[in-house]
Amino acid sequence: MTEEKTPKQIVELLDKYIIGQNEAKKSVAVALYNRYRRLQLPKQMQQDITPKNMLMAGPTGVGKTEIARRLAKIVDAPFVKVEATKFTEVGYVGRDVESMVRDLVEEAVRMEEKDQFEHVKMQATKKANNRLVKLIVPGIKRENRENSMQQMMQMLSGNFNMNQPQDNEEVTDAIRNERLSVADQLNKGLLENREVTIEVEQAPKVNPMGDMMGQMGIDMSSLMGDLMPKKTVKRTLKVSDAREVLIQEESKKLINYDSLYQRAIERTQQNGIIFIDEIDKITAGNKKTSGEVSREGVQRDILPIVEGSTVSTKYGPVSTDHILFIAAGAFAESKPSDLIPELQGRFPIRVELNALTQEDFVKILKDPQNSLLKQYIALLKADGIKLVFTQEAIDRIAQIAFEVNQGTDNIGARRLATILEKLLEDVLYEGPDMNMGEITITQKYVDQKLSDIIINKDLTKFIL
């Protein structure tokens, strides 16, 4: 996180995507900025300052998940969303709670790898182009016993790569000149559609046993991969596609993965955010039926992770002491006090998110960056159609969404997506075949498309 992103600036960035819920935005912004403050303190004091985990309570579709997800993107932090109901108590079949930390590390590794790929891209592209030149204009092979034995040893060790031209080739002046010509054409982009045959590493098959080992922090695929040669398959690709494959290969050779994994672990420990959804579903307020896995048992399993513990992963041990946990739930049939007291104490910041009003729906349709209306306008623009919504139509859509939520299940802003899809289904279907330059959605059109469904309560439940 950078020093420039103060709590106020974080809230301003969240405002671009999320309407209302100012209290929740302020709380997450302060919790996040406290991480930066902690890193400015002496090392000894840093260890004693733990993150102020947060508990969000509010109906579905009001922005709980979106606030956390956008927050992670703003500060470029590893983020995972998990559902509390997916976990089972230790001793039962199912995902153990430590898997959320392993998922977070995987996300951090992916982010670090992406950063490193960008860092070495120019160098990797140059190497990939050199390999393409040698694949398009191969040298004259010179086989001898020594080289054959060397290749056999490389294959047994898993290091042999058919894409990599071998040293035992003879390059004549004619071949050298042709390669220079091909290299020049590649640089000018003249050979992008030409086909070339390369060897591509075959994706390993999913092994259920490997998944079980992964939950224990053991990477079976890595262990077996070091012992067994990598399987490859021949593929004929366009030069443009083959280059991307070779760039990936060359990038991996240029990256120091031991160092990358260490940085990923550090990134997880200092910046990681875990969003635990549906925490209300594992409270005592939701009574357990006979034979059901103990909900309190899951809470007690989550407790040490949130309190701060060390989890074994295939990249190394990860401390959860400074990971920020955000728990959320509707709490329609229970309340936060139904959580076990120890877990309540680990979420000192409580935020209640408000149900969305009709005015909120109007703003959600129009104001956010890449709002729903902007998305549909952009989609139909691809067909050469200019889609226009009148203000009266927008107000009517918001009114319908609010009334349907009140009359049936309240699913918050998600109702808008359902209504818009029904409203625009004919336009989306016929769009590619229409020659109309502009389509205006009026209040009258909204009423025509949706009035029958709204009047019939049974249809409303099934369609909207």
Swiss-Prot record:
TM ranges: none
Q: What is this protein called?
A: ATP-dependent protease ATPase subunit HslU
Q: Which Pfam families match?
A: AAA, AAA_2, ClpB_D2-small
**Gene assigned in the entry:** hslU
Q: Which InterPro entries does this chain map to?
A: AAA+_ATPase, ATP-dep_Clp_protease_ClpX, ATPase_AAA_core, Clp_ATPase_C, HslU, P-loop_NTPase
Q: Quote the SMART domains the UniProt record gives.
A: AAA (SM00382), ClpB_D2-small (SM01086)
What organism does the record attribute this protein to?
Lactobacillus johnsonii (strain CNCM I-12250 / La1 / NCC 533)
Location(s) in or outside the cell: Cytoplasm
Q: Which residues bind ATP?
A: 19, 61-66, 277, 342, 414
Gene Ontology terms: cellular component: HslUV protease complex
Q: Which family does it belong to?
A: Belongs to the ClpX chaperone family. HslU subfamily.
One molecular function GO term is:
ATP binding
